[in-house]
């Protein structure tokens, strides 16, 4: 496994600040959303994998335009769940 440098990533992303945004968003996708990486995982952490993907040109700043999957449960879903479980007196706000 080769080391990833910021300079390698900056060939594909405009500046360091944008690199942080792109890498963190991709790392969250890998860690929380179960999206398959485009490079070998090699027992690395999601942040390292995301930087390797950027350095190899697989992930670009276009990822910032994508909407994140929303894992928050709506109040209606919670209320329906409480109703089906008969949780009387429990309030969802």
Curated annotation (Swiss-Prot):
Annotated GO CC locations: DNA-directed RNA polymerase complex
InterPro entries according to UniProt: DNA-dir_RNA_pol_omega, Pol_omega/Rpo6/RPB6, RPB6/omega-like_sf
EC number: 2.7.7.6
Reactions performed catalytically: RNA(n) + a ribonucleoside 5'-triphosphate = RNA(n+1) + diphosphate
GO molecular function, one term: DNA binding
SUPFAM superfamilies reported in the protein's UniProt record: RPB6/omega subunit-like
Keywords linked to the UniProt accession: DNA-directed RNA polymerase, Nucleotidyltransferase, Transcription, Transferase
GO biological process, one term: DNA-templated transcription
SMART domains (alphabetical): RNA_pol_Rpb6
Subunit structure: The RNAP catalytic core consists of 2 alpha, 1 beta, 1 beta' and 1 omega subunit. When a sigma factor is associated with the core the holoenzyme is formed, which can initiate transcription.
PANTHER family in the cross-refs: DNA-DIRECTED RNA POLYMERASE SUBUNIT OMEGA
Primary role: Promotes RNA polymerase assembly. Latches the N- and C-terminal regions of the beta' subunit thereby facilitating its interaction with the beta and alpha subunits.
Family to which the UniProt record says this protein belongs: Belongs to the RNA polymerase subunit omega family.
Protein name as it appears in the record: DNA-directed RNA polymerase subunit omega
Originating gene: rpoZ
């Amino acid at each position: 496994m080769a080391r990833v440098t910021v300079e390698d990533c900056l060939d594909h992303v405009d500046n360091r600040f944008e690199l942080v945004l792109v890498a963190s968003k991709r790392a969250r996708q890998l860690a929380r959303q179960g999206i398959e990486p485009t490079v070998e995982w090699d027992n690395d952490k999601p942040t390292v994998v995301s930087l390797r993907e950027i350095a190899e040109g697989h992930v670009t700043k276009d990822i910032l335009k994508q909407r994140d999957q929303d894992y928050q449960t709506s109040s209606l879903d919670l209320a329906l769940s409480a109703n089906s479980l008969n949780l009387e007196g429990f309030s969802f706000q």
